């Protein structure tokens, strides 16, 4: 996780290329919210993979696909549509979902509905990497989690201060739920030296200068504002 411009998309692309180079037989999905990211992700993954192997990626095993998707395959492929097809649950297109659930978060609603209607979960991918996770509901991340083969490798990148919804992304304990004994299905363990980190914060921003960032935070959070004593204190 990190601010916009901290390199989250670059890290995801590099990780995808590395995993594909180490495990060429794995089925890997890279998904996102903004359609224009697809070309950028493909170019980055291709470049990083060639740097590591001097070969082109096997795009049959690396799927760069949109989150929603539609029938027809190819450019229309998507995570949600693949889940519905594999688990024999009803698929909703954008217009149908919006008409039924409104404009607030129709995609999150249909993801939750698909999860509740699926009798079993068919594993499809070995790894799923999600960019712009702050723009998705927890239901979509749970849907991705249920599409994974054991040991369920899910990587998601997000910016807590930049999202299309009014809510921030909950903790993994909330997103993925609990087991029957009450323990979390997913829990980020504290960092132990010599072991991979599970929660990584990208602290540098390469897109904006420090004065611009400090000014934006001061205005956005109202740091120097003096609210009225009888007011709410909110900006």
Question: Language-model segments: which ranges?
Answer:
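Inter-Walker segment of RecA-like/P-loop motor cores
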Residues: 48-109
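Conserved helicase motor core of SF1/SF2 NTP-dependent helicases
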Residues: 1-59, 65-73, 127, 134-235
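Conserved helicase/translocase P-loop NTPase motor core
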Residues: 88-128, 135-150
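Short amphipathic alpha-helical segments, especially helix-boundary/capping motifs
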Residues: 17-18, 84-89, 116-120, 186-193
